[in-house]
Amino acid sequence: MTSERALTLAPGKVSTADIYEADFSFRREFVRQILQREFILFEISMYIIFIVTFCYKIILFLFRIIPKDLDHRQRNRGRKMSASA
C-alpha cells in the first residue's frame, strides 16, 4: 500500500505496518533532500576553495618573479653605467 493511501484511510482501517511504511518513505525522502542540499553546499565550498587557492598561487608566483626581475634589472643598469663611465 502506498503511503498516500495509508494516510487517507479511516483511522480504524489503517494498519500499523501502513503507518510505518508511510513514515519510513517520508523520512527517506526527507533524508535524501537533506543529503542533496549538503552535497550542493559542499560542492560550492570546494569551488570557492579552489578559486581562492588558485588566486593565492598566482599571487605567490608574482611575488617570486617580481623581486628576481627587479634584481636582474638593477644588475644590468649597474653594468651599463660602469661600461659607459
From Swiss-Prot:
<feature type="transmembrane region" description="Helical">
    <location>
        <begin position="39"/>
        <end position="59"/>
    </location>
</feature>
<keyword id="KW-0472">Membrane</keyword>
<keyword id="KW-1133">Transmembrane helix</keyword>
<keyword id="KW-1043">Host membrane</keyword>
<dbReference type="GO" id="GO:0033644">
    <property type="term" value="C:host cell membrane"/>
</dbReference>
<keyword id="KW-0812">Transmembrane</keyword>
<protein>
    <recommendedName>
        <fullName>Uncharacterized gene 11 protein</fullName>
    </recommendedName>
</protein>
<dbReference type="GO" id="GO:0016020">
    <property type="term" value="C:membrane"/>
</dbReference>
